[in-house]
Amino acid sequence: MFAKAQRVHFIGIGGIGMSGIAEIVLNLGYAVSGSDLRRTSITARLESLGVVLFEGHAAANVIGSGVVVVSSAIDEENPEVREARARKIPVIQRAEMLAELMRLKYGIAVAGMHGKTTTTSMIASVLAAGELDPTVVVGGRVDALGSNARLGNSHYLVAEADESDRSFLKLSPILTVVTNLDREHMDCYRDMADVEDAFLEFMNRVPFYGANVACIDNPQLAALLPRVRRRVFTYGTSLGADFVVRMLPPAPEVRSRFEIASAQSVLGPFDLHVPGIHNVLNAAAAVAIAVQLDLKEQAIVQGLKSFRGVDRRFQLKGVVDGITIIDDYGHHPTEIRATLRAARDCGYANIHVLFQPHRYSRTRDLLDEFVTSFADASTVEMLDIYAASEAPLPGITSAALVQSIGQPGVRYAASTEEAVTAILDRAAPGDLILTLGAGNVSQLAPLLVERLQSRLPA
C-alpha cells in the first residue's frame, strides 16, 4: 500500500460494500474521507470512527487525496471522478482496493448468486473460534461484529466477492467458495454461458496450492466443475460430494442440526440458530474451508453454534401478541423460495408476506420464476417495484406480476398503508409477518411492530 500520509477518498462511501472497505483502510492507519448523497446510519458510524464525510458530490472533496475509490454506481461524469482524473489522482474500483488488501493476506473469497453474505460471515465466525483472528469484509452487518468489517491481527482475510459487475475477477484469493450459479445480474452478463465463463475464470485464479469449495447441489455449478483446472472440493446433500451433509433431529432451541461425512471422517454434529437448508449448505461451506485450514473440530462446532445471523437475513424484528415479525433481504425467486421454505419449517400457522420487487429489469427477466416463488406463503401483499435508479419498463408492474402469479391470497397493494393495514387485519397469534425485498421495505418491519403493540390492551 502507499504511504499512510496520503488520504484515501471513497465516492459512495455509504454503500454496504464501500463502507466495509473504508473501515478496514481506516483501521490500517490511513486517513479516510468519503462522500455520499445523504447521511445514513452507516455514514454516521464511519464519522464516529474518524472518517471525514462530505454530503453530496463536489470536485473539492477529492483535493489532497492519494487515491479515489469508486463504487460501481459512480460513473465517469461524477464531479469528483472528473476532478481526480484532472489532478492525476488514481481512480480505482472498490474491488481493486479489496484486491490490494487481499494481496497482502491469505485471501478467502466467497462468490455465488445467493448466500454470499451469510457464508462469508459463518467462515469468519469459525476462523475466529479457531483463534485465527481474520480480517473480514462482508456485504451486511454481522451481529457478532456490530459491523460489516473487522480488521484482524492475522494474515487471513475473508471477503465477500461481488460478481454483479465482474469485479470479483480482480481478486486473487488462495481459497474460494462458490455457493451457486443462477440467472442474476443479467444487465451485466449476456447469458448463462457468460456467467459460467466468469465463474470459471474466478475459480481458476487460485494458485496451484489453493483450492475451490463448491456446492454440488446446484445443477448449474455442478455442470461447470469439470472445466475447472484448479482443485475443487464439493459439498452438499448429494452422496457424490466430498463433504456430504446429513441432517439430524435438532436439539431444543436449535433451528438445524447436521453432520458432515467425508472420505476421512464424520464431523459434527453442528448446531445452527438460523433456519433453512440453504443455511445448512452455507455452514457446510464453512466446514469445508475450516478443514482446508486444519482447524480443530471443536472450533468449527463453536463457531457455527455462536453464529446468530446477519442484518436483514431472516432477522427477527419482534414478537407481539404471539405474532412474529421477521425481515429478509430476499429478492430473487430462488432466495424467496428458500426463505419461505425456512419459514414454513419453523412451524408458523400462517406466513403473511409483504414483498417489494427490486428493479424493473429483474422483474421482467425472471417473471416466470417469480410466478412460482410464493407457493409457501399464506398471503402476499405486493408493493410497487423498487426502481433502484432504473426507468420504468412498459407493462412491468407489480399489479401485472400479481396477475401472472394468479395465486389466491396474493394481491397488489396500491400503497404502503394499504399493505400494512391488510396484513395486520389478517395476522393472528402463531402467525409470521415477513417483510421481503432488497429495497426500502425493511423500514416497514418496525412500523408493523409498533402497530401491533398499539393494539395491545393498556
Curated annotation (Swiss-Prot):
SUPFAM superfamilies according to UniProt: MurCD N-terminal domain, MurD-like peptide ligases, catalytic domain, MurD-like peptide ligases, peptide-binding domain
Keywords assigned: ATP-binding, Cell cycle, Cell division, Cell shape, Cell wall biogenesis/degradation, Cytoplasm, Ligase, Nucleotide-binding, Peptidoglycan synthesis
Enzyme class, spelled out: ligase
GO biological process: cell division; cell wall organization; peptidoglycan biosynthetic process; regulation of cell shape
Coiled coil spans: none
Any one of the GO CC terms: cytoplasm
Subcellular locations according to the entry: Cytoplasm
One of the record's GO molecular function terms: ATP binding
Residues reported to bind ATP: 112-118
Catalytic activity field: UDP-N-acetyl-alpha-D-muramate + L-alanine + ATP = UDP-N-acetyl-alpha-D-muramoyl-L-alanine + ADP + phosphate + H(+)
InterPro entries in alphabetical order: Mur-like_cat_sf (IPR036565), Mur_ligase_C (IPR004101), Mur_ligase_C_dom_sf (IPR036615), Mur_ligase_cen (IPR013221), Mur_ligase_N (IPR000713), MurCDEF_pg_biosynth (IPR050061), UDP-N-AcMur_Ala_ligase_MurC (IPR005758)
Domain of life where this protein originates: Bacteria
Entry EC no(s): 6.3.2.8
Biochemical pathway: Cell wall biogenesis; peptidoglycan biosynthesis
PANTHER family, A to Z: UDP-N-ACETYLMURAMATE--L-ALANINE LIGASE (PTHR43445:SF3), UDP-N-ACETYLMURAMATE--L-ALANINE LIGASE-RELATED (PTHR43445)
Family that this chain belongs to: Belongs to the MurCDEF family.
General function of this protein: Cell wall formation.
Listed name of the protein: UDP-N-acetylmuramate--L-alanine ligase
